[in-house]
Amino acid sequence: MFKLIVLFLMICAIPFFSEELTHKSITVRTTYYNPVSSQCSGNPLITADGSKISLQKLKNGELKWVAISRDLLKQFPHGSKIKVVSKKHPEINGVYEIHDTMGPKHTYSIDILAHQSKGHLFGAHLVSIRKVK
């Protein structure tokens, strides 16, 4: 009887353990934004955490920054690095730093900071993200 109780408790605990393991990688909607006043509130060259966007570095591909939806901010706070994996657009795969926050209407989303000449190339799609240490 004791073995059955232990087995039952182990089976009941599986969802909790697997959720704990899989929360490291989640699927989110990704879009792209440019540092222009029509797409940002306040100064478009200053992110929510106070970081300054260098347009030259952005154009050269040296800045790999994202904005994250507010519901994910606790799990992925400003300054965190995330690995982005896209099956549809593998060219965007890589490690990005979180420096900005999306508007309140967005959930389970990231917004990749892109130079005006590049962001429109991909459109909205789903990606997998996980925190990088």
What would you call each of these model-derived segments?
Residues 12-20:
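Short hydrophobic alpha-helical membrane-anchoring segments
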Residues 19-133:
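Solvent-exposed, well-ordered loop and adjacent helix/strand elements within mature globular domains
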